[in-house]
Amino acid sequence: MLKYSKFVFDKDFSRIVYCCPSEISHNNHYCSELKNIFPNLEIIYGLPNVDALQLRTDKNHKLIIVDDQFDSCTQSKEIYDIFTIHSHHENISIILIGHNFFTRSKYGTTLSRNTTAKIIFYDKADQLFLSLLSRRLFPSHPKILSEAFSFLIENFPENYAKYLVVDTSPSSYLPQSFMIRSNIFPEKDGVVRPIFFPPN
């Protein structure tokens, strides 16, 4: 996503902060590889703190990526504040990478409701998740996400990581009929050929 940020995001970021789990601080080979690819990437271990990172002083657009700390995020007042306050007033975007979207937690529901885009990867071992999310987002089309993945599986078998972007942003430039899409990155020829799944 960072590699093709100009195709994915509508603004450039003055700073990008990548937050790794504190448990891997002793073995940071992965983070070192990231720094080699993205030299300007700021890497920290654990959850972010807006004041400690001095993100309030920079009025330009900033991005925080929190990787593999979803359970901690849904219990964190700091993450809650980033979603509900700082993202609106401090020009901060945040990406949470997790494995259990419906985890029961103190702030999980609020984080979900304040998430403007969800990227869902196909997991054939958990079809119930797709059904639950479809019913929550598209109550009149409870099979829309499963049908979209079935289309990708049938027509793009060579793509290992099949994903859907569900755009629920109120400021999205696309109409509601295009809120579910895939293939958002450029292909080998440099052209982006998105696929849309209108919930009709």
What do these predicted ranges mean?
Residues M1-H26, C31-S32, N36-I144:
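Conserved P-loop NTPase motor cores
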Residues K3, E78-D81, A117, L128-N200:
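P-loop NTPase motor core of the ASCE superfamily
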